[in-house]
C-alpha cells in the first residue's frame, strides 16, 4: 500500500501492539481499550490508570432480619440482621448478571458486597457497616466502577475481558467527560 500511497501513514499497533515493541508502531498507533485503563492482555500485567468512574444512586436503605431473603429467586439469605441498600442500576444498564453475589461497590472507599441476584434495574448491597446511613436524608451514590473496582478486575471476576465490561455499559447513563 505504501508503494502506491506514498503519503499515507502506516499503522499496525492497537492497544496490545503498543505494549509489544516499537517495531510494531510504524507511523502511528491506535489505542483503544488502553485509553480507558483496560488491559488488552489476559495474562500480562500492564500498569494502566483507570479513568472510568460509574456511580449508582442508593434509592432505598432498609433493615432485614436473619433468614430474610433478597433478590429474585431468593438467592441471598441473611445469616444475621443486616442493613441492605438498593441501588438504581442493573443488567439493563450493562451490569452482567454474573456479578450477582460476585461483586462489590464502594462508598467513600468502603467496600460493600452485592447481595443476591442482579435484576434488570436494581442491585442490593450490604450496608451493615454504615448504620448511620439508615436515617440519612442525603442523596447517596456508590461507585460501581472506580480505581478499586476497575474494568480489568471486574472482567476477571466473571471470566471475560475488559472490552466486554466496558462495551456492555448501556445508554441510560448520564455521561460526564473530564
Put a short name on every predicted segment.
Residues 1-178:
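Active-site anion/phosphate-binding pocket segments in diverse small-molecule metabolic enzymes
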Amino acid at each position: 500500500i505504501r508503494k502506491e500511497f506514498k503519503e499515507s501513514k502506516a499503522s499496525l499497533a492497537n492497544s496490545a501492539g503498543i505494549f509489544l515493541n516499537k517495531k510494531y508502531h510504524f507511523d502511528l498507533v491506535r489505542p483503544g481499550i488502553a485509553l480507558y485503563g483496560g488491559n488488552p492482555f489476559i495474562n500480562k500485567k500492564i500498569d494502566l490508570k483507570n479513568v472510568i468512574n460509574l456511580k449508582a444512586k442508593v434509592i432505598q436503605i432498609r433493615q432485614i432480619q436473619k433468614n430474610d431473603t433478597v433478590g429474585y429467586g431468593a438467592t441471598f439469605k441473611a445469616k444475621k440482621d443486616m442493613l441492605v441498600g438498593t441501588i438504581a442500576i442493573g443488567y439493563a444498564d450493562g451490569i452482567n448478571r454474573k456479578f450477582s453475589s460476585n461483586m462489590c461497590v464502594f462508598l467513600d472507599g468502603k467496600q460493600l458486597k452485592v447481595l443476591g441476584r442482579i435484576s434488570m434495574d436494581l442491585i442490593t448491597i450490604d450496608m451493615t457497616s454504615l448504620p448511620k446511613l439508615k436515617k440519612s436524608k442525603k442523596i447517596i451514590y456508590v461507585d460501581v466502577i472506580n480505581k478499586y473496582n476497575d474494568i480489568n478486575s471486574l472482567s476477571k471476576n466473571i471470566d471475560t475481558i475488559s472490552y466486554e465490561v466496558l462495551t456492555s455499559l448501556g445508554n441510560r447513563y448520564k455521561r460526564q467527560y473530564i
